[in-house]
Amino acid sequence: FVVNSGQEEFHVLKGNRQVELINKLMYKIPVPWASVRFDAFTFYLSFNYLKAKKPRLLYLAFDGTDEYAHDGQYDQYLYSMNRLDGYIKSIWDWVQSNSGYRNKTTMIITTDHGRGDKILKEWRSHGSSIKGSKKVWLAIIGPDTPSTGEIENSDPVYSTQIAMTIARLLDVDYKNKKEVGTEIKSVFK
């Protein structure tokens, strides 16, 4: 399994010119945040990995929207969301147009927290005191998952269930010293 995040260099695809360039650019282009890289880097690194290594599952978590929200830059927050839509569409369109991947690859996209959405001035924040910040969105699309579109009025799903869901999708026996949730039943056909 490959995990890569933040300002961490991507060492998996040695010799891939685009990945090597991104690794250099991550350290040469100033990022306004201490431990977060631009989402474009995450997208291109993951897309190159997907094409080269053919994983059965790709988990994506982008950070740009969170950082722009904390900074109060609503315009950049919206631009970032729009770019993410394009990145996700590019990956999924490529997966579906490639017979080696179509109906074989699962994509999971989520975030680690929600945002304050009840009181306008709190949209920049999250945490236990901010109403709405415990609610996150989760997108799972793949061959094992029914195509249901947006699900509303269902039993709650929790972030603690994602690890066990990934383990089942990959047919891996997952153990953790900390308590984890059960698999998300609605993900499976």
Kindly label every feature range from the protein language model.
Residues 1-52, 162-164, 181-187:
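Active-site-proximal alpha/beta segments of enzymes that process anionic O-linked groups
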Residues 20-21, 41-45, 76-79, 83-90, ...:
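Extracytoplasmic/secreted proteins, especially bacterial periplasmic and envelope-associated proteins
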Residues 46-90:
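Active-site His/acidic residue clusters
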Residues 52-58, 100-106, 134-136, 143:
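Loop/turn elements at helix/coil->beta-strand transitions in domains of secreted/extracellular proteins
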Residues 83-124, 166:
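Metal-dependent active-site segment of extracytoplasmic phospho-/sulfohydrolases and closely related
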Residues 125-170:
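Substrate-binding rim/cap in mid-to-C-terminal beta-strand-loop elements of soluble/periplasmic
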Residues 157, 172-189:
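Polar, surface-exposed loop/tail segments
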